[in-house]
Amino acid sequence: MATGGGPPDEALSDQDLPNWSHESLDDRLNNMHWNGQKKGNRSAEKNKKKFVECDLRLTNDISPESSPGVGRRRARTPHTFPHTRYVSQMSVPEQAELEKLKQKINFSDLDQRSIGSDSQGRATAANNKRQLADNRKPFNFLPSQLNTNKEKSKSPPKREASTRSLTKDFLASALNKDFLSNSQAFLEEESKREPAIDSSQVVSRLVQIRDYITKASSLRDDLVQKKDLSVNVERLSNLIEHLKFQEKSYLKFLQKMLASENEEEDVRTVDSAVGSGSVVESTLLTFDVPSEASDTTGVDPRQEAKEELKNMKKQHALLTRMLQQQEQLRTLKGRQAALLALQHKAEQAIAKMDESVVTETTGSVSGLSLTSELNEELNDLIQRFHNQLHDSEDPPAPDNRRQAESLSLAREVYRSRNSSTSDTPLEDKSPLFNNVGVLLEKKQKMDTLLGELHTLQDQQLNNTAFVASSVSPRRSTEQRTLGSAVSSALTSDNRAARSPVTIGAYQTASVNESEDEENQNPAEKLKKLKEVRKRLNELRELVHYYEQTSDMMTDAMNENTKDEDETEDSEYDSEQEDAEPTTNIRNPQYRSSWAQMNINSNNQSGTNNRDERQLNTECEINNRSAVNLRSFNMPSALDCLYNIEHSDKEEDGNRELDDEDAEDQGSRASLSSQNSVADDVQSVDFEQKFNRLVAAKQKLKQLQDLVAMYGDDSESEPVAPERSFSGDQFPPEATTLKQQPNNTRPNVSKAQKDIALKEQAREKFYESKLQQQQRELSQLQEERKKLIEIQEKIQTLRKACPDLQLSTSSAGTNPANRQNRQMTTTTSTPDVNTNGNIVVPAMPDPEDSSSVDNEVWSEIRKHQILREDLRQRRKQLETLMAEHQRRQGNTETTSAASIRSDDSDTQGLQQQTRTEKTMATWGGSTQCALEEEEEEEEVDDEECLSDVHQIDIEEDEQDNTSCENNSYPQNSIRKTSFNGRSSKDGWKNQCPLSVEGNHRPSPKTRQQQNVSMRRQENYRWMSELSHVEEKEHWQEQIDQIKKQLDYSTSICQTLMRDQQALSYLLQSMITTPYSVMPSNVGASQVQLIMHQLNQCYTQLNWQQSNVLRLKQMLNDLLVQQPQHLQGESHQREDRGSSAPPLTSPNIFPNFSFLPPTMNLLNMPAFGSIPNVVPGMNFNPVFPHGFENFTQNVASHTDTPLQPHDQNTSGKTEYMAFPKPFESHRSNSTEKERNPPKKPDESEQGRRVWVENHQKSDQEKKPACFGAGLSAGGASAKLAEESRKVKQFDEVSVESLSSMPDPVDPTTVTKMFKSRKASAQASLASKDKTPKAKNKKRKVFHQKSKGIKSCGFQAASASSASEPNQTTCKHAQTEEVVVGNVIKTSSAQRVEKESKATEMSSEAGSDVSMFETLRDTIYSEVATLISQNESRPHFLIELFHELQLLNTDYLRQKALFALQDIVTRHVSEGNAKKHETCTKALESTGWMASTSELTPSESLVTTDDEMYAKNSDGPVCQEGEQNDGDNISSLSTSSNFEPFATDDLGNTVIHFDQALARMREYERMKSETENGLVADCCNNLNAAASSLEGTNDEARGRAQHSVDDASGIPCPYIDSKQLDRQIKAIMKEVIPFLKEHMEEVCSPNLLTSIRRLVLTLTQQNDESKEFVKFFHKQLGSILQDSLAKFSSKKLKDCGEDLLVEISEVLFNELAFFRLMQDLDNNSTAVQGTVSRKPEAVVVLESFTKEADKEEKTCPEENFSATRETDDEDKDKDETETAEENRNFDAEVLSGKSDISEEDDLDESLPVSISFTKAETQALTNYGSGEDENEDEENYEFEARPVDVQTSLETSSEIADETEKEEMEVRPEANIENEKALSLAVNVMGELSIHEDQAKSDCDVLAHPSLLLSNEKATDFSGTALVNNVKSPVDSPGTSGAGSSDTESPVLVNDFETGSGNLSQKSDEDDFVKVEDLPLKLSLPQEQIMKDIEEEENKNNLCDEILNINDEENGADQLAGDPLALKEPDSPAIHPA
């Protein structure tokens, strides 16, 4: 600062400086990131990594990490301090924008105390790392120091060293070089610029600039504070940097001006200032003022400028003098200023440290005189060192480099950058070499003082405990840094001359240690610290000097520095000590005997930093604590540990070498440091410890190998090696990760501990850990034995089920397990370790992790890559396994897998919960967590071994690292958890059959889940977390319940033994034709057996009452879990629980009857047992829908009514669950209604089964997996099937679809088989989670699939769980909509809840039911909320509605209402399904299932298709479902989860009323128009069923096959039509938006947009009230949705706005259309409108489903494409946001409609991107089909009429083609289209398909189109006409034109005779025959004939299901695409 340029820079930076000084060092470091300084290297890298971690911390560790320094930091940087450090010249708009961003981003201060001051600073710094470089360099000296203190408070260990180094480097380097060079450069530059400019102008400019900087800084700080590390922050940082540069330039210029004026004066002033420190003061005036200002919330920039002017005058003098002075003086004075700053900081820090280690800001500078003296002495020393450097050999220089490096690699870099500069000053300072001797003496004294200070600080820190430790590590680091700096100089001296300084260093080091040991009193330490304060300041100055010296030396050594690590290590090692050259690069630090502690720590840090930051951090941390304590030995030990770790990774020999080296080095260091004894002792200890570690690691490896050998047998063996490798390789890293946190903590704890105590404790810990590890190893060995036994059992199971086991276990599980294990080892270890890190030391760990050396990171990266590879392979394996399982006993495999999954999930997930959570933070960690769970569960023992191995290593290392206590406890915890898992696994192993059988499949299942979960890894993540947490909460309960169940099982077994005969009878009967039991087994026998079983149950009932209560809780939990795939996992776990009972499957099979009751509760738990027991299966039927069982028993075996009795007895308690199963009961009730047809019922059961099955398929797959492994023999297989059925039923109980099977075991068996593929697929989605990758995913996936309904169901179910109340409303609506779906899952849950509530009331567990459900409800609600974040109004309304369900009575009433709806719908729907669809199983499967799952219909359809696909390629299924999940999650996650529509939420508000109204209207219209009064909308339930499964539509189908076919699709809502309609609307909206693109979204504009949209979506339906209701709802939703865009520039939010509008429109129109669709004859359209929320929910599900199905069906071949579409649409959503700007014609062109085709043929204007529309309501513009943008515009203009209605959308492809044609020849097209539409409408069948295929219209819009058409047909031919494409439809009509949407466009289906034509008679709306494409030359009669033929030939279900077969993707485009004239807009496919 005395240097000419320095003051201006400082003055410039001073504003920043205060802030920086207050900000974390990282901020300054990062921001300043002294460009030329070496600090950058290590400290910069550290800072970078820290910053990375800061980011992590900001995200993860902000509070904790920053918490240590919160108070401190807060004290330093008053939160009140304006963050306007960096005021930048931001334009007002930019500032406003930043403000907006800040406000927007500033969700919370992120604990601004910590973040604002530190994290924010760090984040800002990170953003500004290089930006402030020169600007803040001077300032950073003080800020660095101050911040160093802060940093001490923060992450003292890590930042400490970097801070010290940075500070020193900054001070030395920055002052020397930046100030000198930069200042001069600037000054000269300025002088060159405008020396004549008035200083006042410059001052005003400076003031302005500083004001800008302040503003920009504040903005950036705010942004950073808000974690907004966005481009804005970077821009701000750049701006600030630029401004500061200008400021600097102006200051320099001003100073130069002033200097020119006051040059002489100032020279003298400078001289005096130098002596008196006024220079620093003058330079610091600005600093201090700003710092004070920052402390006092900022000084007016102008005041600052004025003060700066004053300062600048002074500084001008300084500058003048600087100009006069040589760079030597400038460097010296810069150093002086830096030293003064450092001293000031150090004094403050010391004072605060003394006062309160936390408070580190006070303290008087040792004195300017000292500084000046030090400057002189430093100059002398520098010269001497410089001379010595020249005189000395290179090795000393490398040593210095290394030590300097230890000081700071960054510094070296800086030095290398500024080497010439510092050399020059050094040369200038050559006269000072004379003073080197004196300075060396002083330095020795300083070193001694440093030693004392270190001792005091260390001791003080130790005494001060954590606070002190946090500070002292820093200080120690500082001192070590100082020492290392001194040592660096000394080392160079040592090598060069072995100068006394070196001796001083040694003495200092020894003194430090001795003092560390001696001065352990905090008081003494404080005193000495105070005394040492000056000394420390002096030492700091010396450090700076040394840094400078090292800089000079480094400059001299820079060439060498680059080769320093190895070369210097070798040189240094060889020179210093024996040549342990490169091997112990880490250890050279130790080799740096002179500064063993410091250098070890520093070099360790430095070298390790180069190599591995984390390790450096460890080392630093350890060195900070340990080095402070035993920095010498600790670093050695740490290095040894570290080296051993890595050496272990590399070679034990290397470890030993490293240990020896470390020991030798430690000894050498000790000898060098004269503390050889302690070091030797420690080194010996460490050596022993290391040997122990090595031995332990070897043992662990051996154990791992053994475990690997035994774990998977042949398969595990390769895995074990992998794991060993991964474990050995990565775990050390992981260990390092753990260690680091451990080190971090131990630093604290050990900081508290004395060195000796630490060593002793360390030894104790090592011993204890070794003992524990030995115990754990013995445990692991025992577990390994168990695993071996399990393996044997598994082998037995494999023999029993060779295909299953081999394929599942071997092919899938084992490879997966290998991968999983390896992943587990890798993932688990890293993740687990990470968990340990994150969870336990999470805050420091991220830093450590982030700080971990590049090596660690590279290895971690490698492991992650390997993990990804493993995941990919696992996915492949899962795919193969899924197919294999499908081919093989899907049920068996699935059952076993499910069981296994349950076990593994239960056990694994419980503990994995954290792991998963933690892992979630790691890329694939979540999956890894799951995999780990699997692995850990299966491989827990092995994993534990590996983990223990790692842990042992970690523990040893950590112990060595002095992280023993914390490390080991964590490790112990991990081990405990692992052992717990192992124990659980052991327990599972105790139940090897189901457990193992499940064991292996489970990994598969879980792998499959993981497959899809990987895709939706993040998605699953949420619900899983909640579920995992829930699991954690109730896992114990589950375990207890399982124990009780086991106990009950044992009792039941005893009872069953008493009834062996019955068991045998049951088994024999069941073993005989499985269906015989329920259907044919002598009723008397069955009754007798059931009666006896009931007696047994009665005996057990008291137990079961308890067990049932527990099980009810379990089931509730499980119900929740099914909702979350984890629920299924939990069920799997429960199955696992039941799996333990499975250990006595035969007994339980006998006892299975009890299990039914228990199985209802136990189904998950005893699910295996039920599976085991065919007879049990008989009961599983009951358990599955135990209600159903009772009913079904009544149906199947009236005697089983005793099961009824069971139900009665168990049912009272049990009823709660049967009630949840009452959906099943509904099914079973239907089946019971059907019972007369028990065979039929079997069939119906099949159908229901199919429906359920398809639902269940998802569930059944898990069931299949679970069951698959359950049994070993035929009976076992049967039992498995029973088990499967049961598990399936369990799962299916989830889906309620198993019931039919349980009801009719035959059905179950048959359906079970038929389900295998689909069930597996479904299970994959549900159980496996791949389908429903998350339980959320499950919901989503279901959602996405039409699982939308299911998902919706799940959502409803979730809601049903908590929002049971809302679900009652929603579920009523939804169940009306989703009906069966919700009924199935939601109703199941709800029924479970309601019945459980009932039964709970009956069982006295009413509260417990809801309490049990509460977690699920919370998780569901959390999921719901998270998924509906985009529609807060929905959530608000939903919760408002839920709040209304404030009593159990209301809840039960709602649940019962749902049950009634579901039951009625199921009974009616199933009857009609069976009646209506002969394609029954599949058609009915998905149609009936659709009835249940109206959205799920698509799900089912999608499932069937997907199942077929999945059978063909589970990947597609997963992908599709993933796409569906993603899409539905994306589009419907907000839409669907929230019950698929925001509207639903709004609707829900008055949904009952509106729904009642809508239903009434629907009823009226359906009566009047459809004549389907009784069938369609006669009942709300009819409407509900129409909504649900379109059962009414199914009824309609019964009346109208077209209506039937279309009926299903109707609720299925053609997303294409919707997409088209929305596009049409958006075509109008987008131009409007474009017109106002530059405007701000004012309320008026938004209102105009809303009105425009509403106008475009005007429904001309007769049912004005529904239309009004719809529009009112839509308007309110639009208003709500658009409100968030208020005050934003349209161009900024236009995409989002369009997306929002399109999403809302899609939801609303889909709902509206769904409501219409509910009116199978578009009569109900009005009702639909009123019911739209419901309809939208289902509709969206359908629409998405439909899109998915359309994609699925038409695109079966395009499945991938569809997936791609979905993905693309997902992308498109994002892209659409971008492309939304392009959204004009493209999207509107209906391209979204042909999204599939777009994927196929981007040129195709039509794309079924409505998935985007689904995903992005705004598919219209945002469908990502922007390429059609022009076309869309053209279409808008060319055929504004051609607003595609949803009907039109269904024919969207055709329409697109037609559009192309129509645009080419719109009228003819319209006519043809209209004719076709009419024909299609009349036919309403796939014939349209053909006709349209014939006709240019790609009516081939396929089933989806047909669906749409059928919908339209149901609603009106208009829909088909629209589908065909009513180009006439105006954009508005597209919104309102489609009959589905009641858009005027709807040309009523003449067949339906709905008034839609008249209603929609708007000419624009009418698709006129003349408007139809000319290509549609077929007369209407011909078309109708074709349609009829097509319809006769093709069932819509068949068509949809078979679209792949019937139509290729190319064929899907009906008509001759080549015949289509390319529309003007190129977007339309030129074909």
UniProtKB/Swiss-Prot annotation:
Q: Which GO terms describe its molecular function?
A: identical protein binding
Listed GO CC annotations = centriolar satellite; centrosome; ciliary basal body; cytoplasm
Q: Where is the composition biased (Polar residues)?
A: 114-130, 469-494, 581-590, 667-677, 736-750, 806-823, 888-898, 960-981, 1004-1013, 1524-1533, 1843-1852, 1922-1942
Q: Where is the composition biased (Basic and acidic residues)?
A: 42-58, 149-162, 1127-1136, 1221-1247, 1771-1784
Q: Which residues form a coiled coil?
A: 302-394, 523-549, 684-711, 757-805, 858-892, 1025-1049, 1550-1599
List, as start-end ranges, the regions of compositional bias called Acidic residues.
Answer: 562-580, 930-945, 1824-1835
User: Which subcellular locations apply to this protein?
Assistant: Cytoplasm, Cytoskeleton; Cytoplasm, Cytoskeleton, Microtubule organizing center, Centrosome; Cytoplasmic granule; Cytoplasm, Cytoskeleton, Microtubule organizing center, Centrosome, Centriolar satellite
Stretches the record annotates as Disordered: 1-82, 111-165, 469-495, 550-590, 649-678, 712-752, 806-835, 882-1014, 1123-1146, 1219-1247, 1318-1345, 1514-1533, 1746-1802, 1817-1870, 1922-1965, 2007-2031
User: Per the UniProt entry, what is one GO biological process?
Assistant: non-motile cilium assembly
- Which residues span the membrane? none
Identify the stretch(es) annotated as Self-association.
Answer: 1-484
Please provide the record's keywords in A-Z order: Cell projection, Cilium biogenesis/degradation, Coiled coil, Cytoplasm, Cytoskeleton
Q: Which stretches does UniProt call biased (Basic residues)?
A: 1331-1345
InterPro entries with a match to the protein in the record: PCM1_C, Pericentriolar_Pcm1
Q: Which domain of life is it from?
A: Eukaryota
Renumbered to this chain, region (Self-association and localization to centrosomes) spans: 745-1271
Show the PANTHER family listed in the entry: PERICENTRIOLAR MATERIAL 1 PROTEIN, PERICENTRIOLAR MATERIAL 1-RELATED
Which family, according to the similarity comment? Belongs to the PCM1 family.
Subunit structure as annotated in this protein's UniProt entry: Self-associates. Interacts with cetn3.
Write out the function statement from the record.
Required to anchor microtubules to the centrosome. Required for centrosome assembly and function. Essential for the correct localization of several centrosomal proteins including cetn3 and pcnt. Probably involved in the biogenesis of cilia.
The protein's name: Pericentriolar material 1 protein
Q: Which organism is it from?
A: Xenopus laevis (African clawed frog)
Question: Source taxonomy lineage?
Answer: Eukaryota, Metazoa, Chordata, Craniata, Vertebrata
